[in-house]
Amino acid sequence: MSLTKSLLFTLLLSAAAVQASTRDEIERLWNPQGMATQPAQPAAGTSARTAKPAPRWFRLSNGRQVNLADWKVVLFMQGHCPYCHQFDPVLKQLAQQYGFSVFSYTLDGQGDTAFPEALPVPPDVMQTFFPNIPVATPTTFLVNVNTLEALPLLQGATDAAGFMARVDTVLQMYGGKKGAK
């Protein structure tokens, strides 16, 4: 289990070694509006701590609530894939609507209009996410940001209702081990 966590942690951070302007790319991923991030200076008499994102509660169909701030959607896409061109804008709209984060990897080195800043996928990331499933685009996973556990979501395009129904099913199957109440 700790090897899996180490690999997932490494893969989420391995994007930093992909290109020379890594810091700028990471800032663009975390700040999609292109706003530069400046480190906040703590007020006098307070200590500087890393702030945890505000909870974004999502009610599952079984009545449980899950904090979407504890999850990140990892998208594998290609700039020339017609299914990605169909699905990626849907995913981007859902991310904005529900407040979850999307980390996009590209298999062909190209983004698309929804995710133009997709990072080229390193080989170790491919091996971690696709050990026993075929490589297809688009493919999405839910990654728990606290445990780095990756849960397969979908391969192929779907509509908004289909994607959120799958998120609901996967989070119920996961049992809400982390971030659910």
UniProtKB/Swiss-Prot annotation:
Occurrences of domain Thioredoxin (ranges): 37-172
Taxonomic superkingdom: Bacteria
Signal peptide feature range: 1-22
Localization of this protein: Periplasm
UniProt GO cellular component terms: periplasmic space
Keyword terms of this UniProt record: Conjugation, Periplasm, Plasmid, Signal
InterPro entries to which the protein is assigned, alphabetical: Thiol-disulphide_isomerase_rbB (IPR014109), Thioredoxin-like_sf (IPR036249), Thioredoxin_domain (IPR013766), TraF/TrbB (IPR039555)
Name of the protein in its database record: Protein TrbB
Organism: Escherichia coli (strain K12)
Gene symbol of the encoding locus: trbB
